[in-house]
Amino acid sequence: MNIPPLNDAPSLQVAAGVATITLQRPALRNSLNNQDLSTLLDQFEAINANPDIRVVVLRAHTQDMPHPVFSAGYHVAGLDGDTSAPNFFQTVPDALTRLRPITICALNGSVYGGATDVVLACDLVLAQQGMAWRMPACAIGLHYYASGLQRYVQKMGLSLSQRAFLTGLSMPFEQLQAGGLFHALVSESQFEDHLHQLVQQVLGLAPGAVQATKQSLLDVAEGMPDIAAIQAREASSQSSADFAEGRLAMQERRKPVFQGR
């Protein structure tokens, strides 16, 4: 399943259980307009409807950019005359957070504004050294939306979130990695190899167990977990064919072959 992009809107390509979404507007620092947001929501819906997709990689076209930018966030022209635009923007990271497959952000450039929340909405983030992170909401007079603030505090902690929002200053990725934000922080030359290894690592896990565990972790992080639902997921995994295969593979000292059952 490939969904062709409209002009320079985000593209979606699917191969071997991996869906790759690419932001591809480098001339405007991969900023996102309303059409892009609608495209992303449609792509998320298509991904959730395809049970063969087990990993989603979100990346950006940064080649030939003198200073690589993953995304500059919401295209500010879209705010003119539409004060509700941030409410529409938040639907993208909110939906991304709850995607069924495991999501990996291939953060191969600096990131700004609302795009930082898109990054935080991913389950795992592989980042490139030498880049920067900036949240200028208060610098343009905007109070950020609640779910975005929640993701910031959950993923970055209160102290770094305060530094990001209450100063509006740029923070180097190296500073954020000191707090454990990224799965790994690697050089440009190593980036693609590390990304491939991470994707393969996730693909090697039992799909039912890892997707159910993702949902349970999110439920717990939001502070009001449905214990009965989590226990039901646990019980389902214990009776699954994949759990039986995992135990057998461990006994036979081989890699398991999971079927998602």
Pin down the residues of each PLM region.
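Amphipathic alpha-helical segments at domain termini/boundaries
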Residues: M1-T20, Q24, L169-L203, Q211-E222, ...
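A structural preference for short, pocket-lining loop segments at secondary-structure junctions
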Residues: A16, I21-Q24, S38-D80, L96-C105, ...
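A generic structural signal for short coil/turn motifs at secondary-structure boundaries
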Residues: R29-L32, L79-D82, A221-E222, Q259-G260
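Charged catalytic carboxylate motif
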Residues: Q35, T39, F88, A95, ...
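Acidic-histidine catalytic/liganding microenvironments
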Residues: N50, L99-R100, S240, R253-K255
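A short acidic, glycine-rich active-site loop
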Residues: A77-Q90
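Crotonase-fold acyl-CoA enzyme core
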Residues: D94-P207, E245-L248
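Helix-loop "lid/cap" segments that line or gate small-molecule binding pockets
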Residues: A164, S216-V220, R233-Q238
